[in-house]
Amino acid sequence: MAKEISSELLNTILTRVGGPGNIASCGNCMTRLRLGVHDSSLVDPNIKTLEGVKGVILTSDQVQVVFGPGKAHRAAKAMSELLGEAPVQDAAEIAAQNKRQLKAKQTSGVQQFLAKFATIFTPLIPGFIAAGLLLGIATLIATVMHVPADAQGTLPDALNFMKVFSKGLFTFLVILVGYNAAQAFGGTGVNGAIIAALFLLGYNPAATTGYYAGFHDFFGLPIDPRGNIIGVLIAAWACARIEGMVRRFMPDDLDMLLTSLITLLITATLAYLIIMPLGGWLFEGMSWLFMHLNSNPFGCAVLAGLFLIAVVFGVHQGFIPVYLALMDSQGFNSLFPILSMAGAGQVGAALALYWRAQPHSALRSQVRGAIIPGLLGVGEPLIYGVTLPRMKPFVTACLGGAAGGLFIGLIAWWGLPMGLNSAFGPSGLVALPLMTSAQGILPAMAVYAGGILVAWVCGFIFTTLFGCRNVNLD
């Protein structure tokens, strides 16, 4: 295990969050150890001063400790082992003692709902990145070497092999989402997966593709399984709630036999009658909104400028359903490269701070340690170690990101919309081969690279002019 996540560090963190008895859950996203807590008043915010911790985000019921990619997973695994070995106090007693205080501090329902997306989508992100990279590399090779789509031979076969993972992922993605969502909302994962599969089946007996469900209407009512991801999330939530209500009244002897059976029958009925049409309308509305924002340069600037703030509050995972909706409606994720400009603006701001700092200052050392991850799309080290503690550079970094978003929005407005070839992927320079557009991969890569350059330069200029005044540069 790396030094930064040693058992001593994790024991110190465990002590500062109130001990094992205050831990309700332990998990991780790509860069953060996420600890659910019963009583937030027991949490010491000075966790962020520990060596190896890049930042801390506190909510009423969760502590997010920023370690960075890879390390967060190891930290969560080691913390789970520590919790398994530690003597645990009565969690229910702790919760009861502090219930009133927790209610007073409770964050909004919207923020809590968005936090669920981390639980649903984080396990899928490595697959998104891997499949997207393989597809991007294969598409780039085919473009540069002028390989026709119907070509035969070793190279075309190898390229098709690299592309098949993306096809498999997005064909059956709703089942994975349904499974994770049902669990996140407190239900049984397999029930969510089965309900999600209803959105994947075909209901047109004359169709030549897909798998026919065996009926084309629901007791005479038409079936319209549009709005895949949005509908699946709603259905998984309903499935978990219905399962909880059924289990409450089900005798223990019949629980395994009847609970899932009744849950599936009720949820499927609701899905066909209400959730599928509702999901379709929400899907169309969300797609319309973000497609129009993407085609509006100023809308792109606002989205890119505000994204770092979403990262700070830990609700940036809430954009993932939007990514999936855009993939369905556009064929690529046009929002992701716009939001990626936020990280590029921060790189420019960090370089300006490095330039203005004293040669042997701690600030220069902090920037050197965080700039490479920032260039590769991992922004937390720069956020929590460099810009956010000084505030003004954080604001100018947001302005630099907004300038990059404005650039991409202008290019789209002039007739070259582009986006990521996957619902999710790496940002920064690593994302270059994942860009695509109707005009091909190379124009999309050029637009993305131009946006990054604009964000770097503007972040640097804004920070040099406005972000260094009355700021500690030591």
Swiss-Prot record:
Residues 145-157, 202-217, 282-301, 356-368, 415-440 are periplasmic. Induction: Induced by MurNAc 6-phosphate that releases the repressor MurR from the DNA. Also up-regulated by the cAMP receptor protein crp via the binding of crp-cAMP to a class I site upstream of the murQ promoter. Repressed by MurR in the absence of MurNAc 6-phosphate. GO terms for cellular component: membrane; plasma membrane. The active site is at C29 (phosphocysteine intermediate). The lineage of its organism: Bacteria, Pseudomonadati, Pseudomonadota, Gammaproteobacteria, Enterobacterales. It is a multi-pass membrane protein. Its EC number is 2.7.1.192. Gene3D superfamilies: Glucose permease domain IIB (3.30.1360.60). The chain crosses the membrane at residues 124-144, 158-178, 181-201, 218-238, 261-281, 302-322, 335-355, 369-389, 394-414, 441-461. GO terms for molecular function: kinase activity; protein-N(PI)-phosphohistidine-sugar phosphotransferase activity; protein-phosphocysteine-N-acetylmuramate phosphotransferase system transporter activity. The gene is murP. Residues 1-123, 179-180, 239-260, 323-334, 390-393, 462-474 are cytoplasmic. It is found in: Cell inner membrane. It comes from Escherichia coli (strain K12). It holds the Pfam family PTS_EIIB. InterPro entries: Glu_permease_IIB (IPR036878), PTrfase_EIIB_Cys (IPR018113), PTS_EIIC (IPR003352), PTS_EIIC_1 (IPR013013), PTS_IIB_1 (IPR001996), PTS_Sugar-Specific_Components (IPR050558). GO terms for biological process: carbohydrate transmembrane transport; phosphoenolpyruvate-dependent sugar phosphotransferase system. This is PTS system N-acetylmuramic acid-specific EIIBC component. The phosphoenolpyruvate-dependent sugar phosphotransferase system (sugar PTS), a major carbohydrate active transport system, catalyzes the phosphorylation of incoming sugar substrates concomitantly with their translocation across the cell membrane. This system is involved in N-acetylmuramic acid (MurNAc) transport, yielding cytoplasmic MurNAc-6-P. Is responsible for growth on MurNAc as the sole source of carbon and energy. Is also able to take up anhydro-N-acetylmuramic acid (anhMurNAc), but cannot phosphorylate the carbon 6, probably because of the 1,6-anhydro ring. Signal peptide: none annotated. The EIIB domain is phosphorylated by phospho-EIIA on a cysteinyl or histidyl residue, depending on the transported sugar. Then, it transfers the phosphoryl group to the sugar substrate concomitantly with the sugar uptake processed by the EIIC domain. Residues 115-474 form the PTS EIIC type-1 domain.
